[in-house]
């Protein structure tokens, strides 16, 4: 080697040495810096958590925080801190004043190697600590406490949770070998520290190897470090600094900047790295194996990485025109750069997507959970501090600064000092952290919004005090607002979103950003352009819309933007296959719902696993499962809302065991077929079933444990064929003959012991009555209800027999089938969500109508009975008018009797009706029929959503699974090994009922009007007023007569001896128990009615009140009477004025007890007389006299009042009687009662006569018809939502921080106290005559519906009918109809106490009407436009919704122990009503829609551009108030389908994380492939009357364009 070459070599080695030493300094600096950070973390753990938890454990504030808990969580963390403080001190001494290449640190590690063994205890305890913390995090108070500790410690709350801090010591001890390895690599062999570092490396490896947990961690980190060593040109921090494991790796094609390159991608937790594979020339050499394998090309932090699917065949801007197959886009949001990746196969793409979603789920779930929990904790703490500061008095007050007064504010310095005083914090810096957290979370703010929180003389104010507090999370706010905005934009008759030509290219369905901003401001959504621009950016960030070329953010410029959902709708983004996140159909379902109760620790059935699906293996004879209709071999779809057919079989077993342990009844969705063949073996004990009816005959009852039940025959099934012969049109007797013809055993035994299960509760009750009343063998009247076993042999000749058979084969049609579809989608948080959409025919549909008709018939019968008293009017009717009067009465009463007869007949027919189980839309004119009282096409649309329960307090699909916080695979093994434990799930049910609008208009009357037109406003009210006045007068009259009898009894008993008096009081007069005293002396007191109150239709005037305030004048006279009695009694008994027959003992005196009773009776009597007098003087009586004066020209109201006044002046006359002659009081009272009866009877007759005039038979029939239709649909809709709440599956808004069981309980409390809100949505077009009449009929039906109340009773323990959780009963009159819900005992116990005790509640119906086409230019009547007519309906409904909301707020205010301060009270109620805090915006929108319809047509202005937006907004408004929903159109088919599917998609997007871009895609899938398809099939002859000009939101999506077209 030459001198020159040696010199060059030495120079090069010198450079290498210099570089090596320079890197050594970097490693030493890193060691020192990370050690300082680590000690800081340990100090934070000890001061912020350990010390505070020790204080909490010592004070025993929370039973969950004990000294053992704290020890288990933190182990010997304080000892570790002490060691590391010392270690840090030694390291810093070695590296003083700053690190350089010659300094030595190896000896530091050698000195502390034994002390580091202290980690053994901590690491071995860590797994227990993790499990404990996981359990503690489920307790809300503990979670809040831990977040508070972190906050006061000053750490940013969403960075790292406590579990992250607890794992830090393990990560640190494992990091030392890696640091020492790197240090050794950078230390020359001749360096004085080399040997010490090498020894320290081996020592620290030994320390880690002796600790199992640390060893595992170290091995994982070593693998990552080894991997990084093979990357040439690595940039950025080491992989071990941010990552702990590799999740996925593989070769992908990367398209960026117009180039297609093959790259190797590596996905870690928190990082995506891509490299170029390095080509090696010497493939077999050792150097090539040990050297670099890859060239570093880039890295993306997954925190700023977004992934978007690309459909096969797509070629766009980001793919540089290249066609993408098996590809997806990756967006680096930090640099705003995009590139496209392509996998080799669809399976590989799926694997990458799963890995990316899993990584995002883990990271986002942790962050979202922390954010939500922190916000809740801060808001609660802010409210608590606010109340305390208000009570303090001198902290929050008006303060002056520079001639300006700032109201209700406080000083930052005073706030921190006060927190120290009350012990909320321990150090001033904690107060600063708390103040800043309150400011960042929107609880307080600087009065001029110029400063963060500082403990100085700066003014701050709670946002409660200036109305700027917004309790909702920003992300959900954008989601719900975005969904609302999308629907409104696509509800316009003049679209804002439309195709646009721009630079020689047509862009479909786009809107310019500046035009959208104009629209938002014009609509009132935003006040300024800046606010609108921020909203637009939020929409883009949350996946609603994007720039058409992906080149710009949302700006106030003429830039084209498109909603993602419109791409799906146009078909432009759906060429070949659907995307991963969209709503996909998993399975079509034809099933029936079974209700199975546990009995003696068993449900009575067993399952087996066949092809990964649970199949019924066995059904126990006579069990509840057999009674419900379980059959061997059937597939089970769902149990209690859980889709068990998608679970592993061992999980299904665990799920059933947990249900059995909780004694829950099972709601099982089991597969079935519309038509089945059942083979029943012949038996000596009989076939075990009964049939009823004909054309077709129906299985009336099946015996439990019989051969029929075992074969799979169920009550309600329709018999189509017997032994292959069609009998669907045969008579009842013929069907029985076919069944019995082929049997061997004609006279079965043991029939009395059979326990029958019936088709309906009415059938069961009817049979029970027959069995009790009818002697054996009596077959009279039983032609349509005959037991198969008892058929007479003469029918045998009617059957075609091919010899005797071993079984009877029945082909039957199943009833109450549920047609459904199971969907799945990946939510915005990456969670797999499952949806079951079903369309259900309500059970008990016809029998409920029958019971309502029965109640109406009874009410009419009672009215007819009352009309018999009309003859008393003959005294005041002139002779020449009496014939007219008699003819009028007889004619009207005859019509009433005909109606009563018809209703009873219809009721009988409906009770026996079994097929079909729903009422189809009519296509032909038909005479009046019983089914005309049933709602047409009434179906309940049920959508059940289920997904894994999340870690966030919010509980919505925006979070992720709790277990995703665990980062190692060891937890998965634990999870699979734990038997009986399933990951928690969320189950929520949404119900919407659809029907044809109520109508009493026959199809032949094309130009007829509806009831609202035919009946005047005063007519509607007058009838109710008269009926209520009748009831009040009769009730008051009974009370008066009862008082008279009691006074007679009490005063007559005084004439007996004391001994007899005691007997009398024991025998005739009931003893005064506490309850009776309360009833007589407290409840029956004064009832003073003002004249203007008697027409109040909502409240009973004559009601019991616990107040004597209205009776002072009466009490004076009563008091004087009792005092006179007691003082004059002796002298009176000894006077000569006594009758000769009245021989009384000298010792008789009126006891105080008797005085009290007489006092109470008189007081009650006087109050009733006052009430009756006021009623007789009221406006209703004036109107009745005026209406009937043509029959009594000689006696009008004036004559009646002149005669009444002197005879009913009760207080004056009776006071005189009491003073002058108290012992003649009984006769005075009787005279008064007779006079009252006389006047009441006269008024009663006039009222009845007036009512007879109103009883137009045709109008009332029509009114009853639409009322029945509406009430039946209302009861069915409410029943489904009620059962969802009782099954703890109701939640009207997942935006609130509430579990479903709590939301269900709260809704039940809400309806028990405020009543139930019913939202009726009309899609009728009032410009069409028949639909206008329907709308008018509906208005009157809803008016009558307000008089209905709901009550609840427990049903019988032993059910006679299968799969019916509740039945109905109707009682009362048209003015006060009561519907009773009979509920099984398990569900009855879930009701609020008030309802269990017999309390009821009212219905609050509201109707929002909006045609799906513009009504401009159409007129209703009297120059009132159709738009104005709809606006009047909607304005009245909005007012009712506001009134209901006020009742709701009042209920929560009464329920809450809220503070006296009105502002803080409002804030408290806002928190209690968290789902309702969007109401102000919704009220504003609905009001603006109504106003826009009433203004003059101004098509070019934004104010009129509401379209049909009212439908979706009013629906959301009512939904947030917990309303039941009923959607109506002319047939209940086409328009209802469009609306209900849209509502379901909106609910999924708003509450369950359906990505916003798939709203229309999901709607379209439900319309074309969902459960509603079956409704169209059931009504094939019904014409689709959806307007052609309906907005695009109510149109089907366009099909994809042909291949090759853009």
Swiss-Prot record:
Q: Does the keyword Repeat apply?
A: yes
Q: Which domain of life is it from?
A: Eukaryota
Pfam families per UniProt: DEP (PF00610), PDZ (PF00595), RhoGEF (PF00621), SOS1_NGEF_PH (PF22697)
Question: InterPro entries attached here?
Answer: DBL_dom_sf, DEP_dom, DH_dom, GDS_CDC24_CS, mTOR-Rac_regulators, PDZ, PDZ_sf, PH-like_dom_sf
Signal peptide per UniProt: none
Q: SUPFAM superfamilies attached here? A: DBL homology domain (DH-domain), PDZ domain-like, PH domain-like, Winged helix' DNA-binding domain
Residue limits of the DEP domain? Answer: 390-464, 491-566
**Keywords, comma-separated and alphabetical:** Guanine-nucleotide releasing factor, Repeat
BP term (GO), one? regulation of small GTPase mediated signal transduction
Q: Which residues form the DH domain?
A: 23-214
**What assembly does the database describe for this protein?**
Interacts with RAC1.
* Free-text function comment from the UniProt entry: Functions as a RAC1 guanine nucleotide exchange factor (GEF), activating Rac proteins by exchanging bound GDP for free GTP. Its activity is synergistically activated by phosphatidylinositol 3,4,5-trisphosphate and the beta gamma subunits of heterotrimeric G protein. Mediates the activation of RAC1 in a PI3K-dependent manner. May be an important mediator of Rac signaling, acting directly downstream of both G protein-coupled receptors and phosphoinositide 3-kinase.
What name does this protein carry? Phosphatidylinositol 3,4,5-trisphosphate-dependent Rac exchanger 2 protein
- In the UniProt record, the gene name given for this protein reads PREX2
